[in-house]
Curated annotation (Swiss-Prot):
Cross-link (5-imidazolinone (Ala-Gly)): 143-145
GO terms assigned for molecular function: histidine ammonia-lyase activity
Major localization listed first in the record, in broad terms: cytoplasm
Protein name according to UniProt: Histidine ammonia-lyase
Record-linked Pfam families: Lyase_aromatic
Location(s), subcellular: Cytoplasm
Superkingdom of this protein's organism: Bacteria
Catalytic activity: L-histidine = trans-urocanate + NH4(+)
Keyword Cytoplasm: yes
Length: 511
């Protein structure tokens, strides 16, 4: 379990990666408390002075011009939570909800939302008790924030809705009891502060980022294995080639291949003086393609780290100036575009892997037995595994279509341009699963090809990667039930063990 002292606005990508993968024991930095309390005092003054301020004593959306009577303010905040909990579909995973909640706490605790410390502490207590609200995956367009998902999260604070604890679904009231809490009555501004924000979209996008990083590492390892299995040249990874083009991420990708292939390879030495002049693009252009993918991963990581530490509420409370300002920080366009770029990277990583695997089973190109099996004809070998890879790669081409270019007006045209960030980010998990499946097939194929090169061995790191697989899946000597082999390789890739074989500090959240 991760023990995390939250300094609002300063959470790292590596910490968020850990939050997304395992339970967390969260503590709020005491230095954040004065700012939180000062922002609530500004809201209290608005009520005391009978001023009209959006979100505090008005309606919402197109109803923003409707003034709410003082005796209805508590009802207003409860009503917005219950009415906006209108999501649909399967529930988010506990991991996604936990990440979303930590992001929400991080944002609220910065002291610009006018929400009491008591409410923030309730969210912290739920996270620490591993009580995760049941939040439907669908129902947000990423502006005005992720209203429906965050409303479902917030219903539990009222003793409403549902939550999961240890895999069991319980009522919101029971969920509070498990965490040692009682239902709360929200004060003015608090319901809106809980609901406004990009935390659902950002949680999905961060998960997509971490998946993309793991896939990048596995694809680089599998790609290096395929170079060796196909008796490919190391010369395309020469740093001089990439230095004259100048793209930092391409130079780093080439360095990663050199790191894996090393110079001490019996397989590499066995064909130093061969007649082959150039390898096909799927081998030779790996640094250029994977470098471009790495650049998209890094660009997206930069955007998402900022967003993870941002205040995306509306209106915002500036206690120093005794001012409350309405704006549009809830609009998740940066998240949507970051997610779209991650989608491109995930799709291309898979597309290139499928082409490498297709090369390996083609004996004319790889000089390996047809379909990577002896006694071809009787045995079909890896023939249909490549078809599976092709199917997954083609699915990702459709899923990679940018979501951020879409928009559909909501709230009677008051909210007339939206980001579609939630879908842009949510589909990344499915795309990642597809690409992991493609890589699983390449992993099996490359290991098979390397075994055909025996007794010659590859570099130390590539032999380690091959041995990881061989401990789970044996050499394919004749046709057998293939699906379990793919599943074993897939499960191994999901553990992200290949990250340890990569150069340090290559990927933004991996340390």
């Amino acid at each position: 379990m991760l023990n995390l002292t939250l300094k609002p606005g300063h959470i790292s990508l590596n910490e968020l990666r850990q939050v997304s993968r395992s339970p967390v024991n969260l503590t709020l930095d005491p230095e954040a408390i004065p700012g939180i309390e000062e922002s609530t005092q500004v809201v209290d003054r608005v009520i005391a002075e009978d001023r009209t301020v959006y979100g505090i004593n008005t309606g919402f959306g197109l109803l923003a011009n409707t003034r709410i009577a003082p005796e209805d303010l508590e009802t207003l905040q409860r009503s917005i939570v219950l009415s906006h909990a209108a999501g649909i579909g399967k529930f988010m995973s506990d991991e996604t909800v936990r990440l979303m909640m930590v992001l929400k706490i991080n944002s609220l605790a910065r002291g610009f939302s006018g929400i009491r410390l008591k409410v923030i502490n309730m969210l912290i207590d739920l996270v620490n008790a591993q009580v995760y609200p049941c939040v439907p995956q669908k129902g947000s367009v990423g502006a005005s924030g992720d209203l429906a998902p965050l409303a479902h999260m917030s219903t539990v604070l009222l003793g409403e809705g549902q939550a999961r604890h240890n895999g069991q679904i319980v009522s919101g009231y029971e969920a509070l009891k498990i965490a040692g809490l009682e239902p709360i009555t929200l004060a003015p501004k608090e319901g809106l502060a809980l609901l406004n924000g990009t935390q659902a979209s950002t949680a999905f996008a961060l998960e997509g980022l971490f998946i993309a990083e793991d896939l990048f590492a596995s694809a680089t390892v599998c790609g290096a294995m395929s170079v060796e299995a196909a008796l490919g040249s190391r010369r395309p990874f020469d740093p001089r080639i990439h230095r004259v083009r100048g793209h930092r991420s391409t130079m780093d990708a080439a360095m990663a291949y050199r790191h894996l292939l090393d110079t001490s390879s019996e397989i590499g030495e066995s064909h130093t003086n061969c007649e082959k002049v150039q390898d096909p693009y799927s081998l030779r252009c790996q640094p250029q393609v994977m470098g471009a993918c790495l650049q998209q991963i890094r660009n997206s990581a930069e955007v998402l780290q900022v967003e993870a530490n941002s205040v995306s509420d509306n209106p915002l409370v500036f206690a120093e100036d005794n001012d409350i300002i309405s704006g549009g920080n809830f609009h998740a366009e940066p998240v949507a575009m970051a997610a779209d770029n991650l989608a491109l990277a995930i799709a291309e990583i898979g597309s290139l892997s499928e082409r490498r695997m297709a090369l390996l089973i083609d004996s004319a190109l790889s000089k390996l037995p047809p379909f990577l099996v002896d006694n071809g004809g009787v045995n079909s070998g890896f023939m249909i595994a490549q078809v599976t890879s092709a199917a997954l790669a083609s699915e990702n081409k459709t899923l990679a279509h940018p979501a951020s270019v879409d928009s559909l007006p909501t709230s009677a045209n008051q909210e007339d341009h939206v980001s579609m960030a939630t879908f842009a980010a949510r589909r990344l998990k499915e795309m990642g699963e597809n690409t992991r499946g493609i890589l699983a097939v390449e992993y099996l194929s490359a290991a098979q090809g390397l075994d055909f090169r025996a007794p010659n061995k590859s570099s130390e790191r590539i032999e380690i990667a091959k041995q990881m697989l061989r401990e789970k899946v044996s050499f394919y000597d004749k046709d057998r039930y293939f699906a379990p082999d793919i599943e074993q390789a897939n499960t191994l890739l999901k553990l992200a063990l290949h990250n340890a074989l990569m150069p340090e500090n290559l990927l933004p959240s991996v340390h």
